[in-house]
Regions:
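N-terminal glycine-/lysine-enriched basic segments
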Residues: 1-188
Length: 189
């Protein structure tokens, strides 16, 4: 005997369960969206409470009892994880967008229709963003940095100063520090 299979799902039943997992994860993560997003309270591995607005942290904490639903949630978690690896932020937005795309696919849209819809949407979003964009300067840099740190003013000022130091074409990267010390290091080159 090659192995024991405990649970098999096929066809529409499997599709419904996978999408149910996607819906559950989206509901948990989307509540944190944007500057007015809500905080989520959850347990860490030791059972201690954690309060966060970070989408990927919320996503990673979700484990669904039903293994097929959990597969759906895991698909969506990957979108959040990839976003945090590539961009460092925007995980909640990526989760909401990935949910919308998966919902279109779930509702029997053809692959071509889904692909064309995404392409059309990307063009429209880029055009819209270009039409409303304004240069970020002065105190706006401090405000944006502070918002991105969940309103930690001290850390926001530190990040804003780092961006001012490197200028428009410079790059700011963040790494965990040893000993929990927050500092800015400028590397030329």
């Amino acid at each position: 005997m090659d192995g024991i299979v405990k649970n098999l799902s096929f066809g529409n039943e499997a599709k419904q369960k996978v999408f149910k997992g996607i819906e559950k994860l989206t509901k948990a993560v989307s509540s944190t969206l944007g500057a007015s997003g809500k905080c989520v309270i959850m347990e860490d591995n030791s059972g201690n409470p954690i309060i966060t607005k970070d989408g990927v942290t919320v996503a990673n904490s979700v484990i669904l009892r039903d293994p097929v639903e959990n597969m759906g949630a895991t698909l969506l978690k990957e979108a959040a994880r990839k976003t945090v690896r590539e961009a460092g932020d925007g995980t909640t937005t990526a989760t909401v967008l990935a949910h919308s795309i998966m919902k279109a696919a779930y509702n029997d849209s053809s692959d071509r229709d889904t692909r064309n819809g995404i392409s059309s949407g990307v063009i429209k979003v880029l055009e819209y963003l270009k039409s409303i964009s304004i240069p970020v300067e002065g105190k706006m840099i401090d405000d944006i940095a502070t918002i991105s740190t969940n309103n930690d003013k001290k850390l926001g000022v530190l990040i804003a100063d780092a961006f001012r130091s490197v200028g428009e074409t410079g790059v700011v990267t963040m790494e965990p520090s040893e000993g929990g010390i927050t500092e800015v290091e400028i590397v030329e080159g």
